[in-house]
C-alpha cells in the first residue's frame, strides 16, 4: 500500500451496526426517550465528555446514558464509563460489542517519469471494506435485567479500592530518617583506618 494514498473513508450502507440517530436504532433499541447518547471519537477530550455526562446525569429526568465509540476510540469509551461509575454510585451497566463496516477508497500515487508512459493516464483506485470494532456502554440509574449478556451490577463500594497512602512528612536536616531512631551509625575504629591509609 506504499504506492497508494487514502482518498476517502465512508460508512458502508446496510448491514452495519448503525449508531443512528432515530429511536430503535443502535445497540440499545429499548431505551427511554430521555437517554443521553455520547459519541466518543478518537480526538475527543475526556474532560469535556465527562463534564457534559456528569451534568446530564445530575438532572433527575435523565435516567440513562450511552457511551459509544469505535476503532481507536474504544479505550476512551471504556475510560469515560468507568470515570462516571466512580463519580455516580449505583449505576447499572450493560456493554455491547458490535462491528461497523467502513469502506476505504485508495488511489495510486502518480509514478515518477518513466519511458513509454502517457501523461494523462488515469490513476488506479482500490476499494477496501473493513469491519471496525465498536463498543457501546449503557449506564442506567434504574435496575436492568441481570440475565442479559454484558450486564454488570452497581459497584458496592464506590471510590478507589484502597485508601491513598499518607504523604510522608518532611524531616529536618538534623533528624534521623524513619526507622533509624537513635541507633549509632557504625564508624570505623581510629586505629584500623590509620593502618589502611599507611599501607
Curated annotation (Swiss-Prot):
GO biological process: rRNA processing; tRNA 5'-leader removal
Residues modified to Phosphoserine: 172, 182
Swiss-Prot/TrEMBL keywords: Nucleus, Phosphoprotein, RNA-binding, rRNA processing, tRNA processing
Any Gene Ontology CC annotation: centriolar satellite
Transmembrane segments: none
Pro residues composition-biased segments: 151-166
Region (Disordered), start-end ranges: 1-28, 144-199
Compartments where located: Nucleus, Nucleolus
Biased composition (Basic and acidic residues): 1-11
SUPFAM superfamilies, A to Z: AlbA-like
A Pfam cross-reference name: Alba
Domain of life (superkingdom): Eukaryota
SUBUNIT field: Component of nuclear RNase P and RNase MRP ribonucleoproteins. RNase P consists of a catalytic RNA moiety and 10 different protein chains; POP1, POP4, POP5, POP7, RPP14, RPP21, RPP25, RPP30, RPP38 and RPP40. Within the RNase P complex, POP1, POP7 and RPP25 form the 'finger' subcomplex, POP5, RPP14, RPP40 and homodimeric RPP30 form the 'palm' subcomplex, and RPP21, POP4 and RPP38 form the 'wrist' subcomplex. All subunits of the RNase P complex interact with the catalytic RNA. Several subunits of RNase P are also part of the RNase MRP complex.
Role, per record: Component of ribonuclease P, a ribonucleoprotein complex that generates mature tRNA molecules by cleaving their 5'-ends. Also a component of the MRP ribonuclease complex, which cleaves pre-rRNA sequences.
Recorded family membership: Belongs to the histone-like Alba family.
Stated name of the protein: Ribonuclease P protein subunit p25
Organism, scientific name: Homo sapiens (Human)
Lineage: Eukaryota, Metazoa, Chordata, Craniata, Vertebrata
GN (gene name): RPP25
Amino acid at each position: 500500500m506504499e504506492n497508494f494514498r487514502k482518498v476517502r473513508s465512508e460508512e458502508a450502507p446496510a448491514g452495519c451496526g448503525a449508531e443512528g440517530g432515530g429511536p430503535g436504532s443502535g445497540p440499545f433499541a429499548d431505551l427511554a426517550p430521555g437517554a443521553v447518547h455520547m459519541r466518543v471519537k478518537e480526538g475527543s477530550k475526556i474532560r469535556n465528555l465527562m463534564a457534559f455526562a456528569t451534568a446530564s446525569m445530575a438532572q433527575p429526568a435523565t435516567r440513562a446514558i450511552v457511551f459509544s465509540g469505535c476503532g481507536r476510540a474504544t479505550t476512551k469509551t471504556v475510560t469515560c464509563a468507568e470515570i462516571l461509575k466512580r463519580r455516580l454510585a449505583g449505576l447499572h451497566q450493560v456493554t455491547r460489542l458490535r462491528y461497523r463496516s467502513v469502506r476505504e477508497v485508495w488511489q495510486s500515487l502518480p509514478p515518477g517519469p518513466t519511458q513509454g508512459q502517457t501523461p494523462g493516464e488515469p490513476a488506479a483506485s482500490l476499494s477496501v471494506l473493513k469491519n471496525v470494532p465498536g463498543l457501546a456502554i449503557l449506564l442506567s440509574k434504574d435496575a436492568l435485567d441481570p440475565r442479559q449478556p454484558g450486564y454488570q451490577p452497581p459497584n458496592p463500594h464506590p471510590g478507589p479500592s484502597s485508601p491513598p497512602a499518607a504523604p510522608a512528612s518532611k524531616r529536618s536536616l538534623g533528624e534521623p530518617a524513619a526507622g533509624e531512631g537513635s541507633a549509632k551509625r557504625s564508624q570505623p575504629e581510629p586505629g584500623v583506618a590509620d593502618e589502611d591509609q599507611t599501607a
